[in-house]
Amino acid sequence: MCCWPLLLLWGLLPGTAAGGSGRTYPHRTLLDSEGKYWLGWSQRGSQIAFRLQVRTAGYVGFGFSPTGAMASADIVVGGVAHGRPYLQDYFTNANRELKKDAQQDYHLEYAMENSTHTIIEFTRELHTCDINDKSITDSTVRVIWAYHHEDAGEAGPKYHDSNRGTKSLRLLNPEKTSVLSTALPYFDLVNQDVPIPNKDTTYWCQMFKIPVFQEKHHVIKVEPVIQRGHESLVHHILLYQCSNNFNDSVLESGHECYHPNMPDAFLTCETVIFAWAIGGEGFSYPPHVGLSLGTPLDPHYVLLEVHYDNPTYEEGLIDNSGLRLFYTMDIRKYDAGVIEAGLWVSLFHTIPPGMPEFQSEGHCTLECLEEALEAEKPSGIHVFAVLLHAHLAGRGIRLRHFRKGKEMKLLAYDDDFDFNFQEFQYLKEEQTILPGDNLITECRYNTKDRAEMTWGGLSTRSEMCLSYLLYYPRINLTRCASIPDIMEQLQFIGVKEIYRPVTTWPFIIKSPKQYKNLSFMDAMNKFKWTKKEGLSFNKLVLSLPVNVRCSKTDNAEWSIQGMTALPPDIERPYKAEPLVCGTSSSSSLHRDFSINLLVCLLLLSCTLSTKSL
């Protein structure tokens, strides 16, 4: 008669398989290519909850890794064995050895198993302050996953063989609350049978005509249309507004971008109106903002620029990828704009070889923002999303914001940047940019495995340092960037004089003797770079005057364009709030202890009752 209370209490213990947790998971993604491993997640204050649904009757593994490999990873393993759920917190050391974590920070909420699938739901704190756990921030996380047909035993989980993988995600991207109709009209801007050359990098440009609208419409969602099997080939897509002074003859055929023989019409396409990069999904504008079409100020012709990345020089590739734009006649309050901020893509952007860390900065200067905003919108513009962009050497990007010498909260950041995963970050709160503010796109690179200089450029082996700001209301400012002074960079390696007038590119060194008649690129590569020299060079570059780029639509420029400016004096750097360690571990232990104590008391009560009979 005393056994039934124990069974009831067992159903109350954490990890019971009695039923679902009742939680909702607004974010969901497939981790494998066969539809076997689904991940759902949801942030709740200082905690994050996960739901794993996997086609297996054995254990399920999940975790976070600094590189996507098993070394130095934060791992949790769970399942249902003999009708009883389990969940264990593990970690791996630098040698990929799996060890049980002394501080168990993952807490089982629900587990279920049937003949084909296992479902596990669990929570953890964003910041556990356990050295073996990965803190979860707004940055990219490299999720690792695995499963096995057998459950984990007392000795730990068996090796998962090929049932494993990795995927980069941003777990704390704010939820998109607006629900869009599935019947929205759309049009496609998609390349037709583009032959991809057998070289590592190709930029392909094709002009399109926007459908003719008799009245104003708003684009409210943009999705990538990537040809199946080309997910790693198509690295990023930019959509530019072109001059409206054309006829349809410009639509006849595409051409390789930035090529001497490309059509002159392409040169009028300077205003970025949308950007997508590898790993990103569709983008929905906020409920009060849309991309305007149908008015005289809106694009009639656009240029689709697709960056193809073919590092294996594969031959015979034909691509049909592009963008799909969903639109509505239900006009929203504001028109969206895009500002490209950061380092102007140029050979003057230099990164020495062999550097475990090197920092570059691109300045959207107060002079440019002062002139453009005072003329267009003195009350300021409101940023609601940011795309951070770099290439293979990129390790971290931050978009910093300054006002009158004071550093504001970061507009956007990704301290674990992944070249293969770049998407717009929705800001948790819209941020206002005022006349006279400064923006700095700060990029961190690693060139330890490179023997020669890395230059700013279009190739994925070259580098970029850019931020694309989505904002409203739209103003006539499309690019706010900078170029560092090259002569002072060359003086660092001992260059004294170049041949003038400059008639070749890259230009040629005249003196000293060791660099005579070398291009400035060859001279920089000839210099004997050490880590110490690289650090000194980095300090110099960050202090150099910059050439201002401040562009309007239709290749027009603000008057500040081409002038020289100094990096801002930062009187009051931003102090981020310290991370607060979660308490779920202690509260869970207290809860478990209380329930176990109650179980013991009931057992004792049953025993005494039996003896008294």
Swiss-Prot record:
Keyword tags: Copper, Disulfide bond, Endoplasmic reticulum, Glycoprotein, Membrane, Metal-binding, Monooxygenase, Oxidoreductase, Signal, Transmembrane, Transmembrane helix
GO MF, one term, reads: dopamine beta-monooxygenase activity
Name the needed cofactors. Answer: Cu(2+)
Which top-level group of life is the source organism from? Eukaryota
The conditions that induce or repress this protein are given as: By replicative senescence.
Annotated positions binding Cu cation A: 235-236, 307
Q: Which residues bind Cu cation B?
A: 389, 391, 464
Expression by tissue, per the entry, reads:
Highly expressed in lung, kidney, brain and spinal cord.
Which residues are listed as membrane-spanning?
593-613
Q: Where do the record's glycosylation annotations fall on this chain?
A: 114, 247, 476, 517
Q: How does it sit in the membrane?
A: Single-pass type I membrane protein
Q: Which Gene3D superfamilies match?
A: 2.60.120.230, Copper type II, ascorbate-dependent monooxygenase, N-terminal domain (2.60.120.310)
Task: List residues of the DOMON domain.
Answer: 35-148
Q: Which EC class is the enzyme in?
A: oxidoreductase
The residue spans the entry assigns to the Lumenal side of the membrane are as follows 20-592
Subcellular localization, as worded in the UniProt entry? Endoplasmic reticulum membrane
Record's PROSITE patterns? DOMON (PS50836)
Spell out the GO cellular component terms annotated for this protein, sorted alphabetically and separated by semicolons: endoplasmic reticulum membrane; extracellular space; secretory granule membrane
In its UniProt record, which GO terms are filed under biological process? dopamine catabolic process; norepinephrine biosynthetic process; octopamine biosynthetic process
Identify the main location: endoplasmic reticulum
Which residue stretches, if any, does this entry annotate as coiled coil? none
Which residues, if any, are the signal sequence?
Answer: 1-19
Q: Which family does it belong to?
A: Belongs to the copper type II ascorbate-dependent monooxygenase family.
State the protein's name.
DBH-like monooxygenase protein 1
Q: Which organism is it from?
A: Homo sapiens (Human)
Q: Lineage, please?
A: Eukaryota, Metazoa, Chordata, Craniata, Vertebrata
Encoding gene (name):
MOXD1
